[in-house]
Amino acid sequence: MVEKTSKPSAKTEVAPPVKIIELGAAVSVKELADSLETNPVEVIKALMRKGIMANINQVIDFDIAKGVIEAAGFEAKLKILKKSAAKKASPAKEKLSNFPLRPPVVTIMGHVDHGKTRLLDAIRSTNVMEKEVGGITQHIGAYQVEIKGHKITFLDTPGHEAFTAMRARGAQATDITILVVAADDGVMPQTLEALDHAKAAGVPIILAINKMDKPEANPDRVKQQLAEVGLVVEEWGGDTLAIPTSARENKGINELLEAVLLIAELEDLRADPNQPASGVVIEAEMDKTKGPMATVLVQSGTLKLGDTVVAGNTWGRVKAMFNDVGKRIKKAEPSTPVALLGMESVPQVGDKIIAVATEKQARDMVNENSQSTRKTNAVSLTNVYDQVSQGNIKELNIILKTDVQGSLEPIKDSLEKLSTDKIKININRSGAGNVTESDVMLAMASGGLIIGFSTGIETNAQRLADAEDIDIRHYDIIYKLIEDVDKALQGLLEPTIKEVIDGRAEVRAVFESTKKLSIAGCMVLEGKLVKNSQVRLLRGGEVIVDAPSNSLRRFKEDVKEVVAGYECGVGLKDFNEFQKSDILEFYHKEKSR
């Protein structure tokens, strides 16, 4: 960074106005470089001249940043940040202003060992309403607490996977996320995953720094680690409330709940209780004695006993409803979680549920839902140009995975520079390592795609991506990666051919046919086997042969297809060396979207 010097001039000229750069009380080196429109290396050099050693993610305070800004010839100004929750009212919110307030819906997320469950138990034990005798005892996946006369609804999801599964199906169930981080362990990879999912949901985040009772607790380290990934607490000039807690000693619980109420007040959460009920399925199961049972979060309207409801591909009449403490109730207002009985079959988590006027209307809606193919809201490189042209999207969300950490920054910077006035490139998550199931779920939830550079993909992740039609691109050359994205934004990228696995089967026995051909006696494990498909035979994880199937039989009868759970005989063209435990993958190729 070159420090500006003044030069004498023969003429008296009016000096141009000095550019003012506004910053919060704390800023990372990269953010400061972006504000100065310079390379982060130049900022690091400027800091070194002041005796400060820093890396690109280092967070520095305003006074230090001010010195760098002024040395570059600009003026620094401290920006007073407003809470992210205090958003401008949209037309929809203005219409809601006449309706009553509803309880906030909160999800607690974080690393599995950071005390998330114990924190939930502490909240529940000190604030939950007393259970009634004679109700149900099933855990319904949500509960309400009351503090200072105000209710708060907590979704007790097993992890951010369930949270994201709901969003992937178009259901936004949460108003506020509490991110739990242990004060002794600090930020862990699962913490960052949870943070990515919370950010993608676009809801306010409250930081609970838990395990403050531990001797090695270091809350400042937690704040520093989170600041490096863009989550800055209020006391450092950010907009995130940070609450120290100890679930073990029951400390900080009320302060945490008060923080939730503060955010809820700023969000001005309202709903119309008088319209037909609508909500989302947050848990569902087949109860052995009661039949299909669904836990529903009512989001608007009032769900009543006897209502006819539709949820995805099933419907029913509400025969019984139980609240979170097992009490039978006759109605449920907005933000109330209830377990209901009366569905024809078990709905899926994330299904939207709505009350309708008649049974005929319910059946018609189910038929319509069943006939339409469920698709995710994800885009692909092939169709992104059309999506932008049609006004469907204004942002391209990308999950970026590379082989090593050093490859991330140059690829991220190059991709972000491809943003135009019509579409913005967002890197929702970046990291080193294989593409995981969590990456695919984030792509599902954000309507995005995945780009891998010199890295692989986990088997479960590939299966989920195939099932949900998520575009995963693999590259070994950075130039080709950037070129493809650039072409995609201009509508110039040619469609790619991808493999779609239709079904998998395991060889359980081997038979010799009359024509001296080997037939594999198989059990179909998943999907379906289709006659004349291309088949890949795997043995110990290695591909032994890739050949078309020329025989598919059940009980000596030729069949066109065999679905999961059934046995069959399979023959492959010019192949007779089947062995027990071989895996057969039936697949076809198609152009990507």
UniProtKB/Swiss-Prot annotation:
Annotated stretches, region: G1: 110-117
Ranges where the record places region G2: 135-139
Record Gene3D superfamilies: P-loop containing nucleotide triphosphate hydrolases, Translation factors, Translation initiation factor IF- 2, domain 3
Binding site for GTP: 110-117, 156-160, 210-213
Coarse class of the protein's main subcellular location: cytoplasm
Region (G5): 246-248
The name this protein goes by in its record: Translation initiation factor IF-2
Organism in which the protein naturally occurs: Dehalococcoides mccartyi (strain ATCC BAA-2100 / JCM 16839 / KCTC 5957 / BAV1)
